[in-house]
Structure formats: C-alpha cells, structure tokens
Amino acid sequence: MKVLILDNYDSFTFNLYQIVGEILEEREKPFQLDVIRNDEKPFEWIKSANYDKIIISPGPGHPADPAYFGVSADILKELGKTPPVLGICLGMQGMATVFGGEVVRANIAMHGKLSPIEHDGKGVFSGLTQGIEIMRYHSLVAKEISLPNDLEITARVSAGEGKGEIMGLRHKSLKIEGVQFHPESFGSEEGKCLLRNFINS
C-alpha cells in the first residue's frame, strides 16, 4: 500500500506519520508512506504517483487561501473517486470550502480542548464508541447552513463548549471524509482506531 500524508506545515504531522506507520506495519504487507508539503510537488506529480490513500493534514490559516492550503484543494477536487482521501482539521475545513460551503470563525477558539462527540458509526467512525472525547485545536468551523447537499455531517460535539459544532463530514458520492478534531493526538480516545478504519477501508 502506498500512502501520502500531505503536510500543511503543521506540528502534528509527525504524530500522524508515526501512527499511520504503526497501522501499516500491523498489516504485515509491503508499504510506502510519504510526507510531502503542500507546496513541494505539483498536483500532476501527486496524481501520477498513484497513491492508494491520501491524508490531508491539519495546518494554520484558512483553507480558502492557497498560501495555506496549497495543492490540497486540487486533491479534494480531482482525486476523491480514487484514491480515498481523509482531511484532518484544516483538511476537513478544506472539504467544506472546496465543495461550496463556508468556513467561519468559531464562537470560541479551541486550543487543546477535549470534547465528547456523537457520530454516525459509519466510515472512519465504524466501531467507535459514542461519546468518545476528542482533542480540538481550531478557531474555524464549517458553517452548517452553507453546506452543499453533497456533504453529510457525520459527527458533532455532544456536550459542553461548542455543543453541536460539526466534527465530521463525508462526501455522499466520493471517497472523501473529514474530521475537525485531531485523531493523531494522544488526547483523542480511539483516534488510532479511526485512522485504522481509513487505512483498512
């Protein structure tokens, strides 16, 4: 299996690389795990590399700004049929903007905040416990009323600050999912299970 982590210049990318590497080793099959920054290679190069899975990392800034999101937007627009794509934090916000939704400033910025979520139990959430606590580092959120019909909400904050805020999105016809929180953080319960679901799907 050949997996790409597209790095949006985020400090969590190393955590992501480590955990995904462990998951790939569990499979006991040959694999290649690459990390490429969002301005390091042109989209056509990434497309021709024929990755089996692509993860779009967290990062600073707004996903509508190419200076922050780079080639990530092209990947979401062009590669969602094959291969499957998972967007994390900025990656999920990019999902919302690329497909026509809005990403706006949250009422309360979250920097290292644990929150419980409710989820639909499908896709990357398959087999995960309801009410798990997840780690949040974000000041932007997807605006629900703006989301296109192509996207469905898969998870929300279930209690506390930011209750009801969107924590997961899935494209209805493309193999694209996103989570607003950080499954690669040690503070997120069952985060490795979520990433394993994506890799093994």
From Swiss-Prot:
Binding sites annotated in the UniProt record for L-glutamine: 59-61, 93, 139-140
Gene Ontology biological-process annotations: L-tryptophan biosynthetic process
Record field: catalytic activity: chorismate + L-glutamine = anthranilate + pyruvate + L-glutamate + H(+)
Keyword annotations from UniProtKB, A to Z: Amino-acid biosynthesis, Aromatic amino acid biosynthesis, Glutamine amidotransferase, Lyase, Tryptophan biosynthesis
Residue ranges occupied by any Glutamine amidotransferase type-1 domain in the UniProt entry: 2-201
Keyword Protein transport applies: no
Gene3D superfamilies: 3.40.50.880
Protein name: Anthranilate synthase component 2
Source organism: Leptospira biflexa
